[in-house]
Amino acid sequence: GNKIIKIMDLAIATGVPMIGILDSGGARIQEGVIALGKYGEIFKRNTMASGVIPQISIIMGPAAGGAVYSPALTDFVIMVDKTSNMFVTGPDVIKAVTGEDVGMEELGGARTHNQTSGVAHYLAEDEVDAIDYARALLSYLPENNLSETVVYAAEGELEITDEDQKLNTIIPDSPNQPYDMRSVIESIVDGHEFLEVQPLFAPNILIGFARVDGRSVGIIANQPQQMAGTLNIEAGEKAARFVRFCDAFSIPILTLVDVPGYLPGTDQEWAGVIRRGAKLLYAYAEATVPLVTVITRKAYGGAYIVMGSKQLGADINLAWPTAEIAVMGGQGAINILYRNEIKAAEEAGEDVAAVRARLAAEYTYNVASPFLAAERGELDGIIEPAATRISVIKALRALRTKRSSLPPKKHGNIPL
């Protein structure tokens, strides 16, 4: 314990990242309160280091009992498939207390924490893969909150390329047909390289690091291929934590939006989507780093506001001509706005589907058009999809000297 505490103090004092490699059964039972006290001192230092230096935990074996809280307090947790385990209470104790039969892998294995709990951020194939991912993460991060990320010499080309042109045809004709947002991300970033974080957890939202114009950026994007890109509790919490990490270490954030709204259902409401969904709103509103947002297709209701909107403090908001920005989608809106016309069409024996399609198209043109939002100052520009990469480069260049501060306070009260 003393050795760990000493190196943690040194990392904080010298402003260098801290990496923990864990393979521990927990506290030594025979040492009693002394061992527990050392864990408490480690947890406190994890907390003091948060937002000061990057902290990465690599789990290469068991991490049980109190030992799991140290990696939980770090920024990134990497687990090795079929080797790592994390749990507060082990299978034997669970069996004795509740009668429930569960194996170590199912209870707290690497796949469980990557897919189900969201505790882990990367599922490594083996220990070498885990270390390689940690190295890749560090390449995008500064040494501490007062230093800058490494800037690579390669600057972005400011002419539309053949690769850029592919974005002009990526949005399907049907608004209900999905597409892969990763393709959009890879077309914007340097070298088409996107280091995704938590790819298996809440896959309806993508988060990760890349470089644009040779500089590190954090990217948050809805994924239409998963749950139509809707926001749910897990996606909101995943993105909120990532926004706060990027803000703590002065990494600009690029947000790509295609969100039809929040996932409806009693499960979400009863699990606290109001409180827990507000975390992402809070994170964006509190962030002072450069914020650039591009709406590719849908941006409806409260989800539009939450996803890096101008109202929450985004610096530059752009949209493709295919964008739809409104309180709700066309089909839902016409049920309320044009219920009498639809009822009259039914009574007259008209083609109701054709009437609904016409009314929805009128609603989209008259209410949800991005050009209306641009006219009212809610957007800073409508851009050709092929020009996205160039527009993002120009926006981030303009924001390099951004200075912003929050009202003086001890700390805010995020809805945890």
Locate predicted features:
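Ligand-binding clefts of soluble mixed alpha/beta catalytic domains
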Residues: 1-416
